[in-house]
């Protein structure tokens, strides 16, 4: 199962990997049904129900299913952390700490998280509708939080977000539709299976250089990260 953090990427992904499908219902449908406020106006009830909805959706599938989710519990906890820091809602530290173990456990049921970071040369286009808050300051602050979680994935052996020995790969994906697919091909074979978990060959040195090229081209700087060479975090020797 794969999670991605931008809806447009999902459409491009499924066009290239037709084995994959998306759940019929998303957390956005639940928000509408319950009339919840969200994003900058989110509350404990909203965040708690979104988190449980996301986890329940993950539980409907097995490792044999080809499913791609638009957002995952990592996105949910980032919004909760943001709201807690702003102190403008009922979300507090106690609530965030209550959610963290659920988020961490839920990560065991994902194979890959494709993360679409915002960079100066690879900006993410957002649709201005009632489903998303497109306030640029808010979007940038959430992006910074997600990048911090990604850095935690890269460097922290004792992460609060991920179980080190049982966690999904977390991969930056950026650029135009074709470039996004080229990056995904470094981690998924033609059938959409994770490379290294089937009989598919491991990522080659040439492919690693290609990935570094894309990261350089789009201003992704992570000289300290080891995720590229160890996307599943199998090397327990670093923190």
PLM segments and residue spans:
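A glycine- and Lys/Arg-enriched "phosphate-lid" helix/loop adjacent to the NTP-binding pocket
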Residues: 83-154, 166-175, 198-202
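Short catalytic/ligand-binding loop motif for oxyanion handling, primarily in non-cytosolic enzymes
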Residues: 5-6, 75-79, 85, 122-125, ...
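Short loop/turn segments at strand-loop or loop-helix junctions that form parts
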Residues: 25, 70-73, 79, 114-120
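Glycine-rich phosphate-binding loop used to anchor ATP phosphates in small-molecule kinases
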Residues: 46-107
């Amino acid at each position: 199962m794969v999670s991605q953090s931008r809806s447009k990427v999902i459409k491009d992904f499924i066009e290239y990997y037709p084995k994959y499908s998306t759940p019929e219902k998303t957390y956005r449908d639940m928000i509408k049904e319950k009339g919840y406020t969200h994003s900058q106006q989110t509350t404990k009830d909203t965040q708690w129900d979104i988190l449980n909805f996301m986890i329940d959706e993950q539980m409907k599938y097995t490792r044999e299913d080809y499913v791609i989710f638009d957002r995952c519990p990592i996105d949910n906890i980032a919004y909760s952390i943001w709201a807690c820091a702003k102190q403008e809602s009922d979300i507090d530290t106690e609530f965030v700490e209550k959610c963290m173990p659920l988020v961490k456990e839920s990560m065991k049921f994902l194979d890959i998280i494709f993360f679409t970071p915002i960079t100066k040369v690879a900006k993410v286009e957002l649709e201005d509708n009632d489903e998303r808050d497109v306030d640029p300051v808010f979007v940038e602050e959430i992006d910074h939080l997600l990048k911090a979680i990604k850095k935690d994935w890269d460097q922290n052996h004792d992460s609060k977000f991920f179980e080190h020995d049982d966690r999904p790969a977390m991969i930056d994906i950026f650029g135009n539709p074709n470039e996004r697919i080229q990056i995904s091909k470094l981690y998924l074979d033609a059938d959409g299976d994770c490379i290294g978990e089937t009989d598919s060959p491991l990522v080659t040195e040439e492919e690693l250089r290609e990935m570094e090229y894309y990261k350089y081209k789009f201003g992704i700087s992570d000289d300290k990260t080891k995720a590229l060479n160890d996307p599943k975090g199998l090397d327990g020797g670093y923190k």
